[in-house]
Amino acid sequence: MSNKKIEQWEIERYWEIFASLANGQPRLNNSQAASVLRNSRLRDEQLEKVWDLADVDGDGELDFEEFCVAMRLVFDLVNGELQTVPAVLPDWLVPESKSHLVHATRALSTQPEQFERIEDEDDTPGLKDGFEWYMKPADKSKYEEIYNANRNQRGEIAFESLQPLYDSLDVPDTDVRSAWNLVNPSASHTINKDATLAFLHILNYRHEGFRIPRTVPASLRASFENNKIDYQVDNARPAQKWGADGDTETPTGRKTKFGDTYLSRLGAGGKSSYTPKGTNFSDTIQDEEWEKVRLRRELAELETKLNSAQQASEGRRDQPRNDGRTSWGLVKKEALQLLEYKERELRELREGTGRSKEGQNLERLREDVKAVGEQVDGLKSHLANRNEVLADLRRQIDEEKVSR
């Protein structure tokens, strides 16, 4: 068993490169990763093989774990650790969270035996046409409840894990297997969530008296592989969209609704002894790191929007207004200037400076003039008193002269 692994310092360095390229997104597309990968000077055909190996989930993009795988392969090729790109991904390079995908891909090469296809001659009495691929929200919620109760750790469903559900339905075993084959074109031992929902949807309609469809639409079949499924009725093909109403009563209308009996007695499901092996990146890059990247990106976007808004505002302010409308910007400017002037006058009045100081000086001068006037009046009164005293003295002198 190989002792090779991606070291901690490598993962941290790869994270710095990944974060600088991803712009806050969890994945890199081909064009984003090309600038770094092509710096290795490897041939394009080598880089294509590296990309195919690293893209474990086959979605055409590299998340951080897959990016680490690609970078390590590139460095090993550049440093001579590898002479050629390996045909399969070494076990020590398989991300722990995606090891089930690698094992499933390898297992597909064995092509397990598929259930025998049962040809439907459409001669079953009481069955109706009008199957619809559109899932009503209530039905979809019930399908997801069944799926969540029975999925394994890889998020997949095995045929036999739903046997109690089959037993509770009024659906022949041959029709159950036909529905399974329809959503499992690769004849895998398990199917993913989207295929499971479609499988349960087919069983629901068969339980309600509708014939099982012969084929799956090409877009829907592709969605089983891409893990994406379109549940919007507006996107359905006309032949599927305008079928009979799923709520139409059928000869089996008095039966319990699809899955109700099964769900009512369902215990804990989805148990599995599966233990993934491979490189574990979960202890290195935490959610906080992603949050920092997202916040930096949001900050840059806000700064860009702010600059754009400021430029637009300046452009509107500088643009002449010839349409005869009121320039509210000019009105606001004049009002602010008037307010500033009044505030300055009030401040000068309180501090005794400026024009208010001149007014205070005039008032003080008036008070001084008034005080001088009062002093003049006092002096005049004092002079009159002295004159009376002088006159009295002169009279006394005259009387004294006469008496001699």
Swiss-Prot record:
CDD domains associated with the record: EH
Topology in the lipid bilayer: Peripheral membrane protein
GO biological process: actin filament organization; endocytosis; endosomal transport
Coiled coil: 280-401
InterPro entries: EF-hand-dom_pair (IPR011992), EF_Hand_1_Ca_BS (IPR018247), EF_hand_dom (IPR002048), EH_dom (IPR000261), End3 (IPR025604)
Molecular function as annotated in GO: actin binding; calcium ion binding
Biased composition (Basic and acidic residues): 314-324
Residues holding Ca(2+): 55, 57, 59, 61, 66
Keywords: Actin-binding, Calcium, Cell membrane, Coiled coil, Cytoplasm, Cytoskeleton, Endocytosis, Endosome, Membrane, Metal-binding, Repeat
Stored PROSITE patterns: EF_HAND_1 (PS00018), EF_HAND_2 (PS50222), EH (PS50031)
GO cellular component, one term: endosome membrane
Domain called EH: residue spans: 10-100, 139-227
Region Disordered, residue ranges: 304-328
Main localization, broad class: membrane
Record domain EF-hand: where: 42-77
Subcellular location: Cell membrane; Endosome membrane; Cytoplasm, Cytoskeleton, Actin patch
Function: Component of the PAN1 actin cytoskeleton-regulatory complex required for the internalization of endosomes during actin-coupled endocytosis. The complex links the site of endocytosis to the cell membrane-associated actin cytoskeleton. Mediates uptake of external molecules and vacuolar degradation of plasma membrane proteins. Plays a role in the proper organization of the cell membrane-associated actin cytoskeleton and promotes its destabilization.
Subunit structure, as described in the record: Component of the PAN1 actin cytoskeleton-regulatory complex.
Similarity comment: Belongs to the END3 family.
Stated name of the protein: Actin cytoskeleton-regulatory complex protein end3
Native source organism of the sequence: Aspergillus oryzae (strain ATCC 42149 / RIB 40)
Gene giving rise to this polypeptide: end3
